Amino acid sequence: MSTVGCLILHGFTSCADSVNRVPSRLTPHNIPYRMPYLRGHGTLPEDLQGVTWHDWYADANAAFRDLRREVDKVILIGLSMGGLVANHLAAAHRDEVLGVVSVAAAMRFHYKHADRARYVAPMLGMWGDENRDMGAGWYDKETGRQHGNYRRFPAPAFVSLWRYAKVVEQQLPRITAPILIIHSHQDRTIPTAAAEAIYRQVGSVDKQLLWFDKSGHEMLRDGESPAVLDAVEHFVLHHRAHYQSSTHKE
């Protein structure tokens, strides 16, 4: 039987906590997956210094290639920055990608000076505050306070993320795989315009935009995470079944 696997991609300054509930929805169905740390993550904020979007894409692409040695088709699941990378991979590997789940993808930013950041980043060094309340912006604030995301990061790394959003947006019309776009109206990091831009510009005929109202940016762990994960699981199982049925008929 033809096999399908999933590549799970975390966000900017993020940790495995942000996406580690996804595998629990895959393993009962014997779905192989990869969940790599992208360059500069999972260690110290300073390790993002000098890292650019080219590194994040290269790491995700390496994991994609590794997974492809095990499976016939890949479903990409990405949160925030990981959503950008997932869309980029879908545009680059159209014949190998079965579907895309784009969760709160960082195609736009609430930060009103994001477009000016590239001018001041070299002078700013690290952004953020080690003492900031990590529960701010979460519906489930206690879970947010226990989250392991970086509290600060090198300003140039954010500038690279901002530039990456522009790069990926140009690639959206090349995406042909079915896509599920998930976003929260309460996201204080990425505005709803990001999800709307992806939905409007993506080349996929089979596309769905799913909204939530009791989640912050970290949708795979916040207040509505069970429902978000249900949607992810349903998308994966539906498209796996359809693919296996079509290949069986052949």
Regions found by a protein language model. Name each.
Residues 213-250:
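Catalytic active-site module of serine/aspartate enzymes centered on a nucleophile-bearing elbow/loop
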Residues 196, 200-218:
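Catalytic histidine neighborhood in serine/cysteine hydrolases
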Residues 78-82, 86:
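Gly/Ala-rich beta-loop-alpha elbow adjacent to hydrolase catalytic centers
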Residues 13-24:
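The serine-hydrolase catalytic nucleophile loop
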Residues 175, 181-183, 187:
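Short beta-strand/loop motif that positions the catalytic acidic residue
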Residues 101-111:
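Active-site nucleophile loop of the alpha/beta-hydrolase fold
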Residues 188-194:
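Conserved alpha/beta-hydrolase "acid-adjacent" motif
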Residues 28-45:
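Conserved alpha/beta-hydrolase
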